[in-house]
C-alpha cells in the first residue's frame, strides 16, 4: 500500500474518495463544513435526518455529492470533539481503512490527520495513521491453501496536512511509520509461525537473511551448542537439552555510527520457540500459545530491521536467544544446580521458569561488547499479566535515566509500559539452601522476582527488562502476535538517533 502527504483544500481533490470526520452529536469537522458549504448544505441535511450521529465506529459513504469533484465522501464518526484522544484517533483510522476496503475505494485522500488530538502534532498523527493502517490490513495466511483476496483493495492513501510547511514532517512520518510497521509485521510473522517450522534454526536463518538484505550495515553470527559449552553457558544449554532442536544464539550486529568509539545499544530477545514447561509441564489448555514464547526475539528482529531500513546512525546489537523447552529423558530437572556463565550457581525449583536461565547467560555474554545500555525483551512471567493485564508492558531497570527514556518512548509511541520496583526485599525471595540463588521466588511479586534474578547478571552495565507476557499476543477469536513492543523500542532508538519529531 502506498502512502503520501499533500496540502490542499478539500473541494479541489479529484479522488475516488475523500475522508472527513463528524463529531458527536452530528457536528461537522472544519473540513466537513467546507465540503458542506460547497455542496449547498447536502451533508448537514443528511445529518439532520439522523443518517449519522458521529459516534466512534460509525461511518457513512456518500456518492456523487453535488459540486464535489471526488466520486465519494466517507464520513467517519469521531466521538465528542473534546474527547478525541490517541486511542480514539487510532480507532477512527482503523474504521476508515476497513470502510474503504469494504467499499472498493482503491485510493483516498484522508483529512483526519487535520483533526485536533490533544498534545499530538502532525508528525504523530500521520505516523500513527500509517502504523494503524498497516496493522488493520495485516493477515497471516502463509499456511492457508485458500487465501481470501479482495477484488478492489485499498492501494493508495494520501494524508492531507494543514500547511505546506508541514509536508516535510509528514513525509518523514510516513518514512518512519512504514519502517516501524514493517518491523512490527516481521515480528508478528515470526510469532505466528508454528513451532514445527519456527525453531532456533529458523530464527537463525531469518537473522542471516537480514544480514544479506542489509549487507552494508549488518553482520550476523550464530553461536551453536558446542561454542556455548566452551563459553560456560550451562544454564542456557540446560533448558534446551530435552529438545531434538539445537539451541542457537543469533547475534545481529548493526553498525550505523562510523565512530569506532561509540558503544553499542544491545537488545536481547528471549527466543523460546516452544515452551512445554519441561518436567514442570504446563496445563494442556492453551499450550499451543507457547509458540509465542519467542516474541521477545521476534521483537528484537523487527527492531533491527527497522533500524537498518532507516539507516539509523547508531551501533546496535540484537541477540536472538533461540531455544526449546521440551520434556525428554535428557531434560533438566527440578533440584538441578546449574553453574551459569557468570560463575554464579542456580538451583532449579521449576523448569517452567526457563526464560530467565536462557537470558542470564545471554546477558553475561553481551558484557564483551562493553555496551552503552542493554535492554532485554521477554515473555517472562504470568505474574506480569496479573499485575498489568494485556495492555501494558512491565518495565524494570537498574538505571533510572534508561527507565525514564523507555517510559518516555512508550508514551510517545502509544506502546505503553509501566515501571515496577527492584528492591532488596524481593531479592531475598530468591535465596537457596544449595546454590547462590533459586530460579523462582514464590508467587508474591513474581514478575519482580524474575527481574531481580536477571539483575544479578547485569551489574556491569545499565540495563532494563521488558516483560511482555501480557502484551506480546492476543488469545481468543483474534488470536495472534501483536508485534509489541517493536514500536516502543523503535521510538527509543529514534530518540537516541536525534530523530524525535513527536510531541
UniProtKB/Swiss-Prot annotation:
The active site is at residues 282, 356. InterPro entries: Leucine_aapep/pepB, Macro_dom-like, Peptidase_M17_C, Peptidase_M17_leu_NH2_pept, Peptidase_M17_N. Coiled coil: none annotated. Keywords: Aminopeptidase, Cytoplasm, Hydrolase, Manganese, Metal-binding, Protease. It comes from the Bacteria. Binds 2 manganese ions per subunit. It catalyses: Release of an N-terminal amino acid, Xaa-|-Yaa-, in which Xaa is preferably Leu, but may be other amino acids including Pro although not Arg or Lys, and Yaa may be Pro. Amino acid amides and methyl esters are also readily hydrolyzed, but rates on arylamides are exceedingly low; Release of an N-terminal amino acid, preferentially leucine, but not glutamic or aspartic acids. PROSITE patterns: CYTOSOL_AP. Disulfide bonds: none annotated. Its EC number is 3.4.11.1, 3.4.11.10. It is found in: Cytoplasm. One of its GO terms (cellular component) is cytoplasm. Pfam families: Peptidase_M17, Peptidase_M17_N. GO terms for molecular function: manganese ion binding; metalloaminopeptidase activity. Mn(2+) 2 binds at residues 270, 275, 293, 354. GO terms for biological process: proteolysis. Mn(2+) 1 binds at residues 275, 352, 354. Its cofactor is Mn(2+). Presumably involved in the processing and regular turnover of intracellular proteins. Catalyzes the removal of unsubstituted N-terminal amino acids from various peptides. PANTHER family: CYTOSOL AMINOPEPTIDASE (PTHR11963:SF23), LEUCINE AMINOPEPTIDASE-RELATED (PTHR11963). This is Probable cytosol aminopeptidase. It comes from Pectobacterium carotovorum subsp. carotovorum (strain PC1).
